Amino acid sequence: MFVATNRLFVPAERAEEFEEHFRSNMRTFLPGVPGLRRSTLLRPTRPDQPYVSVNEFDTEEDFKAWVASASFKEAHRRNAGIARHVTGNAVETFQPSEDLVLTES
């Protein structure tokens, strides 16, 4: 598994419209992306925290292929509607060190 996150700083007064645009882009451009297991937009619980977009891929190569794809470019071209809500962002990538899944029996 390979994980890419994007920390998106959005002023509270722009949050609702930001979420609408971001969710629309997720639903439009992410289904069918090869190797993409899951995409989650996390809402902050405090006004000083950013939104966090979390994308889980099978491999780093799948992530890189997505970033180079026409779908990625089109989604980010459409992000002009989102960008006006974001005051800053930070992309980070990770490979799991441990993945513990707990379920009830």
Language-model segment annotations:
Residues 9-22:
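Short, surface-exposed ligand-recognition loops at beta-strand->loop->(often short) alpha-helix junctions
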Residues 24-36, 56-92:
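An amphipathic, aromatic/His-enriched active-site/gating alpha helix that lines ligand/cofactor pockets
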Residues 2, 40-49, 77-105:
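Glycine-rich beta-strand-turn "strand-cap" elements at beta-sheet edges
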Residues 10-12, 59, 95-98:
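Non-catalytic surface loops within mature trypsin-like serine protease
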Residues 2-9, 40-69:
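Short, well-ordered beta-strand segments in beta-rich or mixed alpha/beta enzyme
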